[in-house]
């Protein structure tokens, strides 16, 4: 069971299908029909919920946590909640794998790394992994309008302003995967620039 804007759900559903497991994906109803169709084609049971902020108990992430707990009580085989936002194995995989691949494929000639944030696992994990090799590498955040991270890392204020058409990117809280991250640069990217 996972709450996702689609991408992680697609990956989890693909793996679940391969191993013969059932996947249940809780997704905001505002996500693209293409993602929803891909999830259904992979055999996922799709639970669409209204888009709500994380503070709302019916936010798709919180809803998926409750659903996993309920299914775990009644299912013969149990249920597992992936919890991509706060499961630090997400970040760990990027420390141990993604950052090492980047380092090896650039022959160590990398001055910096920049990406946007969904769960925070990629940015924080690659940051840690690259800085373990050489601490002077620069790390940047490319944050869409509507996300709170740009203001948090530039002004110390965790506050969302505006909106964006990007799906699954932008964060309104410091996830466990983001804890301790201190990017060297933060950029607020408007939709016009991103597209």
Q: Each predicted region: which residue ranges?
A:
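A short, small-residue-rich loop immediately preceding and capping a beta-strand
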Residues: 1-29, 109-123
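Conserved beta-strand scaffold positions in the cores of enzyme catalytic domains, especially
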Residues: 46-48, 79-81, 139, 186-188
């Amino acid at each position: 069971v996972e709450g996702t804007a689609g991408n992680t759900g697609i990956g989890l559903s693909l793996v679940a299908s391969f191993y013969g497991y059932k996947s249940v994906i809780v997704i905001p109803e505002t996500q693209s029909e293409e993602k929803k169709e891909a999830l259904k084609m992979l055999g996922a049971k799709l639970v669409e919920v209204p888009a709500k902020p994380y503070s709302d108990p019916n936010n798709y992430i919180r809803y998926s946590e409750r659903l996993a707990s309920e299914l775990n009580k009644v299912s013969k085989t149990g249920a597992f909640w992936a919890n991509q936002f706060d499961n630090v194995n997400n970040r760990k995989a990027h420390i141990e794998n993604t950052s090492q691949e980047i380092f090896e494929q650039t022959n160590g000639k990398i001055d910096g790394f920049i990406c946007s944030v969904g769960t925070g696992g990629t940015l924080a994990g690659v940051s840690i992994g690259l800085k373990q090799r050489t601490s002077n590498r620069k790390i940047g955040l490319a944050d869409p309008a509507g996300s709170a991270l740009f203001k948090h890392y530039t002004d110390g204020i965790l506050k969302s302003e505006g909106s964006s058409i990007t799906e699954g990117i932008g964060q309104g809280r410091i996830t466990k995967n983001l804890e301790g991250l201190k990017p060297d640069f933060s950029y607020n990217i408007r939709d016009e620039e991103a597209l």
